[in-house]
């Protein structure tokens, strides 16, 4: 038998990219239906036929007032909820009605975000080699990844990965996975999509389950998409952020702090009061592990993209690390304008940051800083930590068309 002309090591080297994974484009989308937070308590208690619960309504108003949210977007309209009263009860069988919405609307909203990202990227969609789709809403086979592949007209040979039921940390997870795919497959261009619709979690109030009402006060609908690839061709591609490292960890003593259960009644959501404390108590360890190798100990010298699980989490992280208010400006802006969109949030924040950096005349896509951190927090408690490196802003760059 003739000897092989190449070695495994040579094959492996040829398969891998040279440089780090890079975010090449970002797109976002929301449903048309906009809900203003100031009006939401009256609307919520009216549509769920709970107006007789006056004390509970006052508590909910206070939750909304403290949420630091100005508006959110929701696919569920008053008309649809009126036609599906079981979705307005606290615990009524309603999974079929919820699933019928999300299995259609999740890929559709994802498509809107993906089309914007592909347009900004400016390359033929035939160059997309991988698709990573993430949602906490709606489960079917074939999944939302398949539906989106068909909707966008991607190649049948695109390598798909579907991630269901990850929760709020997953905006970091998809970047970690996309980084590995891009760096280990030379020439790969990974389309990443996070699409979240709260139709699975919407339900009426309960006096015995105030944690469920916290979710009703915070969550909104949205989809975000990014194109990730290594070794960008800068004649036709414009890098936005480099993905330098990525890791995931489960926080100690946090079991049951956030969990969800998909049942006949939809997706129920539960959280303990000490979630902000658990996250802030452990945030410094994650920062040290990520940035000590880089010689960075001043966390005001980096840009921040933190999942806005709620204002208390942001306030306690800010206090624990001694952050200046400006560091979480992009994060708080997205919370204010969209609410908590689960996995999609951090990608919205990346989009806001690169746009605002360009508009403000900053030197880099990361508010003028070179290094940055992206945090995802969610069920587990699970924390995703992604180290980012910004790129210099050239005239007209970093703002989508």
Curated annotation (Swiss-Prot):
GO biological process, one term: flavonoid biosynthetic process
Keyword Transferase part of the UniProt annotation: yes
Active site: 168
Catalytic activity: (E)-4-coumaroyl-CoA + 3 malonyl-CoA + 3 H(+) = 2',4,4',6'-tetrahydroxychalcone + 3 CO2 + 4 CoA
SUPFAM superfamilies associated with the record: Thiolase-like
Gene3D superfamilies: 3.40.47.10
EC class of the enzyme, as a word: transferase
Any Pfam family matching the protein: Chal_sti_synt_C
Protein purpose: The primary product of this enzyme is 4,2',4',6'-tetrahydroxychalcone (also termed naringenin-chalcone or chalcone) which can under specific conditions spontaneously isomerize into naringenin.
Protein name: Chalcone synthase 3
Underlying gene: CHS3
